[in-house]
Curated annotation (Swiss-Prot):
Temperature remarks: Optimum temperature is 45 degrees Celsius.
UniProt protein name: O-methyltransferase mpaG
Organism of this sequence: Penicillium brevicompactum
Gene field: mpaG
InterPro entries: COMT-like, O_MeTrfase_dom, SAM-dependent_MTases_sf, WH-like_DNA-bd_sf, WH_DNA-bd_sf
E.C. number: 2.1.1.-
Known catalytic reactions: (4E,8E)-10-(4,6-dihydroxy-7-methyl-3-oxo-1,3-dihydro-2-benzofuran-5-yl)-4,8-dimethyldeca-4,8-dienoate + S-adenosyl-L-methionine = (4E,8E)-10-(4-hydroxy-6-methoxy-7-methyl-3-oxo-1,3-dihydro-2-benzofuran-5-yl)-4,8-dimethyldeca-4,8-dienoate + S-adenosyl-L-homocysteine + H(+); 4-farnesyl-3,5-dihydroxy-6-methylphthalide + S-adenosyl-L-methionine = 4-farnesyl-3,5-dihydroxy-6-methoxylphthalide + S-adenosyl-L-homocysteine + H(+); 6-O-desmethylmycophenolate + S-adenosyl-L-methionine = mycophenolate + S-adenosyl-L-homocysteine + H(+)
Binding-site residues for (4E,8E)-10-(4,6-dihydroxy-7-methyl-3-oxo-1,3-dihydro-2-benzofuran-5-yl)-4,8-dimethyldeca-4,8-dienoate, renumbered to this chain: 144, 199, 265, 267, 303
């Protein structure tokens, strides 16, 4: 199948623009995807090479440098007045010539703007000034970028084979000259552990979550049909960390017809600040043991089997089976489902992050169906939101 023509892509862009003006779900993501497709349809190979190997690496390095000199913060604070090259060079401790050259590339890449010798922040650069994004930039540049850079030499050396899950011999180890796993390295390098946590938080920030309008039909699939005589528990968030997802769910659908239960390891649960206003109960649970809360309306997992191999993923899912009420309880997996026919960049990005750092992978629909079937479950439906990497897999007892 040949690639779409520029004319047809422009038509799709116009349609997405109208949807965006009408605030329709997925319109923003469609605009971005079609804009990238238009560029790809117009670029010649020499432009692609320059963009890929000059423009983007330079941008990455300059944005990383900007976190050391607080460039985006200064521009944000200046607001509509902006700052001259001389003023910004003074604030950042750079010489004017160097600053101007770096800043011009940020302008060329639409990160900041300039007019009559004055530089201004944009919505994008002002957002990047936030500390969680500053830390995310440091993690991605210092840790991930070298790991990707090791792909050619590492895979040539290992005969182009996929590393073992949880490997101590992968692209990450090759790039950083270590022989320990990525999680072990993070623990031994505290600043980057914090940067990684910020990155994971920032990764999901500003994106639709599974219970938003237009994603998973919560009212139809969970609230309607809830039966307190079967169980007074509406939702169990299994391995839910400190409760971000379940708190979001509770706030969006209050008042709730049933209880919300958060489960995670003891050290995680103990780290949750006391809050009498929260709508969920926090309890300890090991995902490799049988689920103790019986007959709940739904058991939700967000990226829980994600980091495990297939055999462990089957065990995790099978531990839910004894707790499920036939024809009533639902299993909800909030996971990336890689589309083999029309993959989206947000999904392939995360798949390659997993490959680079841990020898892991994101799963296709066929992969998820196989795991759930082996665990004694069956897929009812897979709900997706346009342009969003993570889907919502609904399953039930087979």
């Amino acid at each position: 199948m040949s690639a779409a023509s520029p004319a047809s892509i422009i038509q799709e862009l116009a349609s997405a623009a109208k949807q965006y003006e009408n605030n329709e779900s997925g319109a923003r993501e469609a605009l971005i995807a079609q804009s990238r497709a238009l560029i790809a349809s117009l670029e010649v190979p020499s432009e692609f090479i320059q963009h890929t190997f000059w423009s983007q690496p330079a941008l990455s390095a300059i944005v990383r440098l900007a976190t050391d000199v607080n460039l985006f913060q200064y521009l944000k604070d200046a607001q509509e007045e902006g700052l001259s090259a001389e003023a910004l060079a003074s604030k950042t401790g750079m010489d004017v010539s160097l600053f101007a050259r770096l800043a011009r590339h940020l302008v060329a890449m639409n990160v900041i703007t300039s007019r009559n010798g004055v530089f201004y922040g944009t919505a994008l650069s002002n957002g990047l000034a936030a500390e969680n994004y500053q830390q995310s930039i440091r993690f991605c540049h210092d840790v991930s970028r070298p790991s990707f850079g090791a792909f050619p030499s590492f895979f040539k050396g290992n005969g182009y084979k996929t590393p073992a899950l949880g490997t101590t011999d992968g692209p990450f180890q090759s790039a950083h000259k270590v022989d320990i796993s990525f999680p072990q390295w993070l623990v031994g390098n505290p600043p980057y552990l914090q940067y990684f946590n910020s990155y994971m938080s920032a990764y999901r920030a500003g994106k639709p979550n599974w219970c938003d309008n237009g994603f998973y039909p919560v009212a139809d699939r969970l609230l309607n049909g809830f039966d307190a005589s079967v169980s007074d528990v509406l939702l169990v968030d299994v391995g839910g960390g400190r409760g971000h997802d379940i708190a979001t769910f509770g706030s969006q659908f209050s008042p709730l017809p049933g209880r919300l239960v958060l489960q995670d390891r003891e050290q995680v649960i103990n780290s949750i600040p006391a809050d009498e206003s929260r709508q969920f109960e926090a309890t300890t649970h090991d995902i490799f043991t049988t689920q103790p809360v019986k007959n709940a309306r739904a058991y939700y997992m967000h990226s829980v089997p994600h980091g495990f191999g297939d055999e462990d993923a089957v065990k995790i899912m099978a531990n839910l089976v004894p707790a499920l009420a036939k024809g009533y309880s639902r299993v909800l997996l909030n996971e990336i489902v890689v589309d083999e026919e029309s993959p989206v960049m947000s999904a392939t990005n995360m798949d390659l992050i997993m490959l680079a750092h841990m020898g892991a992978k994101e799963r296709t629909e066929a992969d998820w169906r196989s795991i759930l079937t082996r665990a004694g479950l069956k897929v009812v439906n897979i709900y997706s939101y346009p342009g969003v990497a993570e889907s919502l897999i609904e399953a039930e007892l087979a």
